[in-house]
Amino acid sequence: MGCASSKHRKRCLHCRRGYSPPVDVQRSHSVHHASQNSEDSCHMVALSSSSLGSLKLCDSSFGHNHKHLADFSEKLVSGESVKTGNGFGPNVVREKSDKEKSNLELQAKLMEAKVWSSMMNEKIPKIVPKTPIVTPPGEPETINTWEMMDGLEDVLSPLRSPNHVKSFSFDVGPNGGKSNGSVKPVWLQMEEEEEGFEDFDPEIISSFRKSLQELPSDHPFHISNHDFELKPRFNFSDEEKEEEEQSVGKERVILYFTSLRGIRKTYEESCDVRVILKSLGIRVDERDVSMHSGFKDELKELLGEKFNKGVGITLPRVFLGRKYIGGAEEIRKLNEDGKLEKLLGGCERVEENQNGNGLECEACGDVRFVPCETCSGSCKVYYEYEDDDDDDDEGDDDESVKEEREYGFQTCPDCNENGLIRCPVCCD
């Protein structure tokens, strides 16, 4: 034992290589697969503890995974013997201890629990809560607005100013305090109101007007004298009506308007007034300011400065002789109230099938102007010099100079600045 030959050799006798250090071989547990058929042979499968967690199961279906997991757990726990050995010598089969069996059962249960939890997470859908944005279907709710508005007229609004001046009215009807069950139409009520106002005594109206004029200028019902000067009067008394009819006689209605379409509002108002006046069947003297500058001077003279105010004359304007009636707004209002026909009832009327009664003039085509026959619309006339040989008498020097000045081109005395004259057929 103590001799040199008994020492361990460091090299192999055959290959002369050094021995490798002893390696700890990791032992693994073997699982015994029982034979299913008589022809099958028994074999052992070695599994290490580190490979238990890396087993890949089939994901085909839930029942299929459960079946494979149960088979694997049974095979893992059912083994009763373990094959041991160092790899160089013969393997020795020994029986498993109770501790090893309990560890294998615990590992199988843990693996089954992990697989079950993963499969349940995959099966449960992830539902994201959403707020409903669509109104659920149902019948619309009916709201009675009369019930909501009931009693609102009697309630004083907090937004209303306490200094608000209340309105007043006059009860002129004989049965004004009585209320009938049936409500009259609006147009009947307006006619009754107009008849009631006509029954007022003129002295009462004048005294009431004076009292309103004496109020301070800041008062909402104050009336100034300037308002009565600008507004034409149409409500005449019986005496004034007789005087007016005698003075008017058969005077014509004169309309100052424009046919230019540069300002659309002015042109449309001029057309409206022309249609209203022609519908009454009276003779209208239409004077187009854009065709003749003399009409513009006449209008300025008739209106005066109080209507102009330095701003400019607006068109159209209607006159009865030299009496001003009004513009477009006044004519519309009088026509709607039925007072325009009464006011112009004494004017000269147009006979049927005559120019001005819906028929156009054959000479001017309702333009009321034709080209000048003297200058043919050029506004210029040329006078030639005439030399008389038989005339031996010589006139004075002044007369000769005057005659020389009249020769050549001269301004046409018959037409206006546009070379036009008024139509001799419809503007007689």
UniProtKB/Swiss-Prot annotation:
It holds the Pfam family GRXCR1-2_C. GO terms for cellular component: plasma membrane. Residues 386-405 are annotated as: Disordered. Coiled coil: none annotated. Residues 241-351 form the Glutaredoxin domain. Residues 386-401 have a biased composition (Acidic residues). CDD domains: GRX_GRX_like (cd03031). This is Uncharacterized protein At3g28850. The lineage of its organism: Eukaryota, Viridiplantae, Streptophyta, Embryophyta, Tracheophyta.
